Amino acid sequence: DSPTPNTYNIYYGTAASAXN
């Protein structure tokens, strides 16, 4: 539960969702 993977997941998750 680190802030690094959390932000990475949110950033990529949003980009993937929007993109997709």
From Swiss-Prot:
Keyword Thylakoid part of the UniProt annotation: yes
Keyword check for Chloroplast: yes
Annotated Gene Ontology cellular component terms: chloroplast thylakoid lumen
Compartments where found: Plastid, Chloroplast thylakoid lumen
The entry's keywords: Chloroplast, Plastid, Thylakoid
Protein name: Thylakoid lumenal 18.4 kDa protein
Organism: Spinacia oleracea (Spinach)
